[in-house]
A protein has these predicted regions:
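Short pre-active-site segment immediately N-terminal to redox-active cysteine/selenocysteine motifs
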Residues: 17, 24-29
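Typically the conserved alpha-helix immediately C-terminal to a functionally engaged Cys/Sec
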Residues: 30-46
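Structural micro-motif
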Residues: 18, 67-77
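Thiol-based oxidoreductase modules, predominantly thioredoxin-like and allied folds used
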Residues: 2-5, 23-25, 43, 47-62
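N-terminal leader/targeting and pre-domain segments
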Residues: 1-19, 95-108
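Non-catalytic, surface beta->alpha helical segment in thiol-disulfide oxidoreductase systems
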Residues: 76-108
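The canonical Cys-X-X-Cys-His
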Residues: 28-31, 75
Length: 108
């Protein structure tokens, strides 16, 4: 999982057909660990078809503001460089959501 900045997010989103970006903050250590684990599990299976990134909302607030998230942790899902949805909460099935994104189905 790559740590993203405003400077590299464009290439990151265009590099593969799908992407998941975990938005978090260091002060939310418990939820951060749970979501990172879900991201790592999904990355093991889908790394050839999807990119996995992370944004620390405190370190890069401008990038965090560019995505419609209202709380951390959140995961934003992209298809062909375009945002298709963002979900709040640590207990997400990132793999399932990315598989839906890759098929062209909506996430829920």
């Amino acid at each position: 999982m790559r740590v993203l900045t405003q400077a590299d997010i464009g290439f990151f989103l265009e590099e593969k057909p799908a992407a998941a970006i975990h938005f978090d903050a260091k002060w939310d250590a418990t939820h951060r660990a749970v979501t990172r684990s879900a991201m790592a599990d999904a990355e093991q299976v889908l790394a050839e078809r999807a990119n996995f990134g992370e944004v620390d909302c405190d370190s890069d607030p401008e990038l965090a503001k560019s995505i419609p998230i209202i709380n951390v942790p959140s995961v934003a899902y992209y298809r062909d460089g375009k945002l298709v949805g963002a979900l709040i909460g640590a207990n997400q099935d990132v793999r399932l959501h990315l598989e839906r994104v890759l098929r062209g189905d909506p996430i829920r």
